[in-house]
Amino acid sequence: MNAPYSYREASYTPVPASWRWWPLATREAAQLFRSRWGILLYGLCLIPFLVRSVILMIVFGVLNLGPESLRTRLQTRPIAAGGPNAELDPRRVGFYAAQALEPPAFVFILLLTSMVVARAIARDRATNALELYWTRSISPAQYVLAKWVGGTLLVGSITVFAPFVLWLLAVFLAPDWTLLQTTAGGMAMLLGGLVLATGMLTAIGIFVSGAAATANGAIVVWTTILVGGGAIAELLAAVLRLPELRSWIAPWTAFGVVVRSIAGLNARGASMLGAWCCLGTLLLWSFWRARKRLRIEDALA
């Protein structure tokens, strides 16, 4: 002990790299819950899950809501595969995929990724927080990895964990174990596809954030990619009468096509090759734009 200054001696103890970047990842995943507005936003993103939960309980007779004829039909007869209402039948894997892939889910995923993923690095740069490179002794690659893991955990709680919880609820509400036996394999493939596609989507968002000068600019670019790409794809598909163009141009459509193709679900009018090319091209482009701005020299500038 140094008496005049009351300093304590400390010895250098090396720690694994994961011990240095993992706290940053968990902090990023919990960032949204640090304000009331963030908690409200996350609650809004759970609306598709809550709606599907109500449908699930109606089908299995826990709730008596809606017209009696509809309840009877849902409870007694599985909906024909490929029919207009096939994704309302919890005895099919498509019911759980729709919770994360249908158009209403897009609005909430867009909000969530815009406020968290697309701002992750740009927000740190605006507050000079890239000094984490030397205060936590992490490399730029580890910093980006931490941001990606944190963002993926948060978005994945909606796109992956929520469908899984919904399926578990259906398994325990079902009168026997038939639902488990008939959907377990399909659900495993669906969850794998959701994990892969969610990871790619959040990686693109993280790189967009890394390339942007400001957090607001990152949100604008990210929204333009998802919404603008979808609008252009819809226009060209209608004019040229080529519905598969949506898979090549619209990132959200490509997200759904990748998941459905891995899960073995119906993806009519879609191109799996186009979907992979769309997401892969965006991933490479955003990485190329971000790589120079994430160097240590940039953090010192």
Regions found by a protein language model. Give the residues of each.
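Short, membrane-interfacial amphipathic segments enriched in basic
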Residues: 1-25
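Terminal transmembrane helical anchor/hairpin motif
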Residues: 2, 11, 58-96, 216-296, ...
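Secretory targeting signals
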Residues: 9-12, 72, 89-105, 145-206, ...
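Membrane-interface helix starts
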Residues: 17-19, 26-44
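Hydrophobic alpha-helical transmembrane segments of multi-pass membrane transport/permease proteins
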Residues: 36-63, 107-114, 222-232
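Long, hydrophobic alpha-helical segments
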Residues: 96-123
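Hydrophobic/aromatic residues in alpha-helical transmembrane segments
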Residues: 110-117, 165, 203-207, 286, ...
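Helix-loop-helix units of permease transmembrane domains in multi-pass membrane transporters
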Residues: 120-152
